[in-house]
Amino acid sequence: GPTDHPCNECSVCKSILSGQSMDVLEIDAASNRGIDEIRALRESVKFMPVEGRKKVFIIDEAHMLTNEAWNALLKTIEEPPDHVMFIFATTEIEKLPVTIVSRCQRYTFRRITSDDIAQRLQYVADKEGFALEDNAARLIAVHADGGLRDALSILDQCVGMASGEITPAVVEELIGLVSKDWIIKFLSALHN
């Protein structure tokens, strides 16, 4: 059942880790933000979990839900069935209705360090079989400002853009940065 220390070995853990669990449902509120989607969610809340003790609904980008959608969900949040848990993920908590936030436990996560993001990008590059220069990984990590999803999105775009190894020049071109070499040349020209 639910625990702070999952075993990662049982069938429930394995189905959650593989993204195949019928008891953990993620909804992207950025693209499913209306009342119809929330009504469908309310219907599925009625059903018991298939494998585990809880049915978990993760609503990502929760700040994107419409007011009508929140109003439709309010009653369910106020009196959720014992077998249901909601997780509202957002980067803009101030956009969530106060009536919702007041009924939730709030967990604030710190931004991921640039070093950790750069390491993860190198891991992804190794697993996917493409070359990523360390300085390019660091540049992406700094530009992502603590957001791993943003960093992975930039990396994905670099892969599509690069004809070989992903270098700092590829990253600079993609995100519109001026290279150090150009800045040095510019400052040198100003000085002379």
Can you name each region flagged by the protein language model?
Residues 1-106, 124:
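P-loop/Walker A NTP-binding region and its immediately flanking N-terminal helices
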Residues 8, 15-22, 40, 53, ...:
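Extended, largely alpha-helical regulatory/partner-binding modules appended to the mid-to-C-terminal parts
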